[in-house]
Design a protein with these regions (language model features):
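Register position in tetratricopeptide repeats
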Residues: 43, 49, 90, 124-125, ...
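Residue-level recognition of tetratricopeptide repeat
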Residues: 77, 111, 143-146
Length: 155
């Protein structure tokens, strides 16, 4: 009887130890960095809507730090590059924002978010022909990103 209890306890402790080890893998920390960045961006957007631009920029800067680390750990993910471009653009660094967007498009040319945000960057930098090219990529997607970019282009 004591052997059964001891064996059962040992078995439970062993399983608990392996389940904790499974939670410390590299992939979860990569996702966590990305998730933290996305949360920072969401908070920054809310602050922008309230007119709190300086606080929003600080959130975007935090997001960039998380995204750069995430991109180093797991490079060439279009979604990460999209958010890097977005957050960088929102801090006023259009040149590097564009670089991130173009890297993302090289990986996933029809990425809806990148095409919309890159189009917005082109409008902000007075390159309307390039913005219209991004809009044409989105034309058949039947998505809100098309309408948003079209609204920005139409002014």
């Amino acid at each position: 009887m004591i052997k059964k209890i001891f064996f059962s306890m040992f078995f439970l402790i062993f399983l608990a130890g392996t389940s904790f080890a499974a939670g410390s893998s590299d992939s979860s920390s990569k996702e966590t960095l990305y998730d933290k960045a996305v949360q920072q961006i969401k908070m920054a957007k809310k602050l922008e809507k309230k007119g709190k631009t300086e606080k929003a920029i600080k959130r975007y800067e935090r997001a960039i730090k998380f995204l750069v680390k995430s991109n180093k750990m797991k490079p060439n993910k279009a979604d990460t590059l999209n958010y890097l471009g977005f957050a960088t653009r929102k801090t006023g660094d259009f040149e590097n924002g564009e670089k991130y967007y173009l890297q993302g498009l090289a990986i996933e040319p029809n990425h809806i978010g990148i095409n919309e945000y890159l189009g917005e960057l082109y409008v902000a930098t007075n390159r309307m022909n390039l913005a219209k090219e991004r809009l044409s990529v989105l034309e058949g997607c039947n998505c809100e990103e098309y309408n948003q970019l079209k609204g920005v282009i139409d002014g």
